[in-house]
Amino acid sequence: MIASVRGVVTATGPDHAVLEVGGVGLAVQCAPGTIADLRVGQPARLATSLVVREDSLTLYGFADDDAKALFELLQTASGVGPRLAQAVLAVHPPEAVRAAIANADTAALTRVPGIGKKGAERLVLELRDRIGPVPVGADSAAGVTTGAWPEQVRQALVGLGWTAAQADQAVTAVAETVDGAVPPVPVLLRQAIRLLGRTR
């Protein structure tokens, strides 16, 4: 089990980062919000979960151990694999996922591509008693935004399953709401996903 990795970021993409650890480049699958905090050439630590399949070994990375624990818990629900669990964390921060499950907020859960009404109800039914304490307070998200946020959000949306045209439309709509200080990329991504959810 690889619990975490620490190394220099050598590359990033819409859904992954490469960290050089002891001369070896490790490809780590990450949610867009996690990738937004990474900088090529800078050291980073990611909490990780290794998913072993018959034909592959895939390392998933997270900003902290809390997100990793929730990723692993989500996979204990029927029909939830690592990709869908990561998609949940790409759309909502861990505290929002816990709140949605604890409060049976299926509307929030169905904003995740790949989760329909029945899937959301199943998540609530199977995980509600195991989700742990739900923090009181508003949704929060950490991240560093650069001038390249529209492309980061666009790539993240395409990676989550929307078409390039839908992603472009959502990015344009979000850009029109940005006035003054630009919010972190994860906040902008969730705003775009909410817009796309209303057009489904």
UniProtKB/Swiss-Prot annotation:
Q: Where in the cell is it found?
A: Cytoplasm
Region Domain III, residue ranges = 151-200
Q: Name one GO molecular function term.
A: four-way junction helicase activity
Q: Which UniProt keywords apply?
A: Cytoplasm, DNA damage, DNA recombination, DNA repair, DNA-binding
Cited Pfam families: HHH_5, RuvA_C, RuvA_N
| Residue ranges of the region described as Domain I | 1-63
Residues covered by region (Domain II): 64-142
Sorted alphabetically, which InterPro entries does this protein's record hold?
A: DNA_helicase_Holl-junc_RuvA_I (IPR013849), Hlx-hairpin-Hlx_DNA-bd_motif (IPR003583), NA-bd_OB-fold (IPR012340), RuvA (IPR000085), RuvA_2-like (IPR010994), RuvA_C (IPR011114), RuvA_C_sf (IPR036267)
Q: Which GO terms describe its cellular component?
A: cytoplasm; Holliday junction helicase complex; Holliday junction resolvase complex
Domain of life, per UniProt, equals Bacteria
Q: Where is this region: Flexible linker?
A: 143-151
According to its UniProt entry, the protein's GO biological process terms are: DNA recombination; DNA repair
Keyword Hydrolase part of the UniProt annotation: no
Family annotation (NCBIfam families) = ruvA
Subunit note: Homotetramer. Forms an RuvA(8)-RuvB(12)-Holliday junction (HJ) complex. HJ DNA is sandwiched between 2 RuvA tetramers; dsDNA enters through RuvA and exits via RuvB. An RuvB hexamer assembles on each DNA strand where it exits the tetramer. Each RuvB hexamer is contacted by two RuvA subunits (via domain III) on 2 adjacent RuvB subunits; this complex drives branch migration. In the full resolvosome a probable DNA-RuvA(4)-RuvB(12)-RuvC(2) complex forms which resolves the HJ.
Q: Domain text from the record? A: Has three domains with a flexible linker between the domains II and III and assumes an 'L' shape. Domain III is highly mobile and contacts RuvB.
Q: Which family is this sequence assigned to? A: Belongs to the RuvA family.
Against HAMAP family, the record matches this protein to:
DNA_HJ_migration_RuvA
What this chain does, per the record? The RuvA-RuvB-RuvC complex processes Holliday junction (HJ) DNA during genetic recombination and DNA repair, while the RuvA-RuvB complex plays an important role in the rescue of blocked DNA replication forks via replication fork reversal (RFR). RuvA specifically binds to HJ cruciform DNA, conferring on it an open structure. The RuvB hexamer acts as an ATP-dependent pump, pulling dsDNA into and through the RuvAB complex. HJ branch migration allows RuvC to scan DNA until it finds its consensus sequence, where it cleaves and resolves the cruciform DNA.
Its name, as the record gives it, is Holliday junction branch migration complex subunit RuvA
| Source organism of the structure | Salinispora tropica (strain ATCC BAA-916 / DSM 44818 / JCM 13857 / NBRC 105044 / CNB-440)
Q: In the UniProt record, what gene is named as encoding this protein? A: ruvA
